[in-house]
């Protein structure tokens, strides 16, 4: 009952004096159902030794959320998807229905590019300025030149598309195509 009222979580992030850490680890006992070493036991040791101990709060709980099952993994993915999309929109990319656009971290997209729903941009994809990526497109590890239009449901993989080129709809560029 008492545990249910606790509104804090252990993020697993610790700042610890190295000497204390190494001596403390040797003294941690594995007296639990899993037979595991519990690093939080170091906190109790530190308190008993009158070491300085402090808990910190984080302004954004989503940044330190635990992931212990597929639901929490999905929630963490959603946090990251929103962060990536928001950063791109603030830099001048237009997203029509950003809730349904999936862009991997590290993808580069130029200003004034418009991305339609259900687009997937993955790996080291680079999209130039003033491009249009229509609905249902998947672009993986490819470069799309400025002013190009990738029409609906096209798949481009490990290829290069030049400037002011129109691809699709329903096109498939296999690896190493240069258009």
Pin down the residues of each PLM region:
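Short, solvent-exposed amphipathic alpha-helical segments in soluble enzyme
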Residues: 30, 81-82, 118, 130
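Long, charged amphipathic helices and adjacent flexible linkers at domain junctions
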Residues: 77-106
